[in-house]
């Protein structure tokens, strides 16, 4: 190889993108009002009682113990969210505790 062939060639230049304003324009046209975002199936829920919150904490603790996960604030939050999502999705569980949190104390 001669020295001119050994020189490294510059990579081809990237093409510049055209103005991305049309995408921004589409985003501005999106519906952003809260009333228009609500689905007809949105339901009002009663606030949690302290008893329900205590039961949720107990279920989350038991879930972490069963899975042998260290009990940290982060893992407790994730366990509680898992339980709430299972109850709201209607996942059937043989545990009476899940039914208690679903129906109240």
From Swiss-Prot:
Keywords: Cytoplasm, ERV, mRNA transport, Nucleus, RNA-binding, Transport, Transposable element. The keyword Repressor does not apply. It comes from the Eukaryota. Pfam families: HERV-K_REC. The keyword Cytoplasm applies. A motif (Nuclear export signal) lies at residues 50-59. Residues 1-43 are annotated as: Disordered. Its main location: cytoplasm. GO terms for biological process: mRNA transport. A motif (Nuclear localization signal) lies at residues 13-20. GO terms for cellular component: cytoplasm; nucleolus. GO terms for molecular function: RNA binding. Residues 10-19 have a biased composition (Basic residues). It is found in: Cytoplasm; Nucleus, Nucleolus. Despite functional similarity, Rec shares almost no sequence homology with HIV-1 Rev and HTLV-1 Rex. This Rec protein is encoded by a human specific provirus. Retroviral replication requires the nuclear export and translation of unspliced, singly-spliced and multiply-spliced derivatives of the initial genomic transcript. Rec interacts with a highly structured RNA element (RcRE) present in the viral 3'LTR and recruits the cellular nuclear export machinery. This permits export to the cytoplasm of unspliced genomic or incompletely spliced subgenomic viral transcripts. Forms homodimers, homotrimers, and homotetramers via a C-terminal domain. Associates with XPO1 and with ZNF145. This is Endogenous retrovirus group K member 104 Rec protein. It comes from Homo sapiens. The lineage of its organism: Eukaryota, Metazoa, Chordata, Craniata, Vertebrata.
